[in-house]
């Protein structure tokens, strides 16, 4: 299945002066501009490309690697603001929009924010949001105590730190379980400490902490 906002392996089906067209399956053919076409590329070859919407809102392919893909979170910097919202540098020619209704608080140019990137099906565009709890599940039923996970620090609370689990869920690291100050956006390995009665997840950030807690 071909998905927008991620890397896809697509086959070259047509050559033109300004690039090549790729078979996008149900998305029709997709242009890979000439400057991104690998040397020696021919009809029938397969290429790894990232799909996004250009400044004319046309679906286009690139071999450039963005800083984040759809379905993931990352710290990005605001480079512009206009009537539509804030625009962030994500490593591609067209900046990434954070609409005003997806901003937890007003964003400012030059500041970096942790955002979740998604494909807005209603507007058919790639967008980002600082309202992480609107997009990430806080009560995943398939996480179990002592399960290894990848964490990204999302923010501070009175109890400790909110953390993103595997780019999909939200959990909590209690301050007592954080053996050092943690930075928003920081990525680190962790473990599920416990699943609360309400289904929310408590986390640990090191094997040593987990072992010490178990020994107690």
What are the roles of these predicted feature ranges?
Residues 1-216:
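Single-stranded RNA-binding regions, centering on S1/OB-family and related RNA-binding modules
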